[in-house]
Amino acid sequence: GALNKMLSLNNKEKDSGVVAMSAGNHSQGVAYSAKLMGIKSTIVMPDNTPFAKIRKTTDLGAEVIIHGNTLIEAEAFVDSLVETRNLTKIHPYNDTQIISGQGTLVLEMLEKHKDLDFLLVPVGGGGLIAGTSIMAKHLNKNIKVIGVQTELYPSLHNIFNKGKNKCQGTTLAEGIAVQNIGSIPLSIIKNNV
């Protein structure tokens, strides 16, 4: 997803550098893609981000800033960096280029296992499940795509079941500890999952 988005940037956006927020793998995807393309990257990570992910992201050449207790707080800081440093924001899930790139995962899966009936996909902000569901349904309309969330962050479950469970707390699955599903992936998820 991150590489697909980075490849879509124009020269001005590349020259200004990129910024993203993530407590998960998106941070490393952006840092890796930026390094490949020679683009300066800044990643904002919430306080609860595991040290291993912080270290891996810095090892890939990104400037890492730890800010906020949640992804929402990290995103607010990213938005301020977009303004003050003139950086290009690479959103982890609410972006069509990110979603399209994440769908390529299904190509790899079906190449090795052509007869898959189900895909169990982790759900944070919804980008991964949106992208994989588009590609899966395109290749096999009968494949079932099932979203998996932590009990502490049931944002998609709440949408489908009119639930009112709060999204909060500490989980080992911090990469999918997202309080709100993105509006772009949600419209896709409602049709495919």
PLM regions and their residue ranges:
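PLP-dependent amino-acid enzyme catalytic core
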Residues: G1-V193
